[in-house]
A protein has these predicted regions:
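Active-site substrate-recognition segment that forms the wall
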Residues: 1-132
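C-terminal lid/capping helical subdomain adjacent to the catalytic/cofactor pocket in oxidative enzymes
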Residues: 122-180
């Protein structure tokens, strides 16, 4: 057996709606921006008390955090990024100094990512009935990139063999009775 695996994150609900499939999915928005600093840390750091991750890049420090529950959209609230910046500032010398060539103390390259969330916090990893060859992988929340290899391996095996691995049992779509 062969199939298609839909791994569209927070957009899976929108993508499946024309097929008559409703998913209990919403988005938790995470904010990310670039901050230019004179001195960067040598490796990524998780600032656990403020729930912010920072990653050094050649162009500056990538700062990411928060979980905003405001719907499945890409509306960006600058005040959220500014709050993250205020929290992270206490950890870095020179946060408020301007990097040469920069004319801005505001967050640069600000964007929002939509993390797919299910009501019970578990992802949906299942065949999409009534379609024999359509499978879904979504709802990983903040762990999508982390869990992608294991999810891909498990669902690819399912799609190729047609046999649901016992490992995937807790992640069935039908656990949300009114949606499947």
């Amino acid at each position: 057996m062969k199939g298609v695996i839909l791994a569209g994150g927070a957009s899976c609900g929108t993508l499946l709606r024309p097929l008559g499939i409703r998913l209990p999915l919403t988005a938790g928005k995470g904010y990310s921006f670039l901050r230019r600093l004179r001195t960067l840390p040598r490796r990524p750091i998780h600032l656990g008390d403020i729930k912010v991750a920072v990653t050094p890049f050649a162009r500056g420090l990538r700062v990411a955090g928060t979980m905003e529950l405001s719907g499945n959209n890409e509306t960006l609230r600058r005040s959220r990024a500014q709050a993250i910046a205020r929290g992270a500032a206490q950890y870095f010398d020179g946060w408020d100094e301007l990097e040469p060539g920069s004319n801005c103390r505001e967050p640069e390259e600000l964007w929002v990512g939509r993390r797919p969330l299910t009501p019970d916090g578990l992802p949906i990893l299942d065949r999409v009935h009534p379609f024999e060859n359509l499978f879904i992988a979504t709802g990983h929340s903040m762990l999508g990139v982390t869990l992608a290899p294991a999810t891909g391996k498990a669902l690819a095996g399912y799609a190729l063999s047609g046999q649901r691995p016992e490992l995937l049992e807790p992640f069935r779509l039908r656990r949300f009775a009114s949606t499947s």
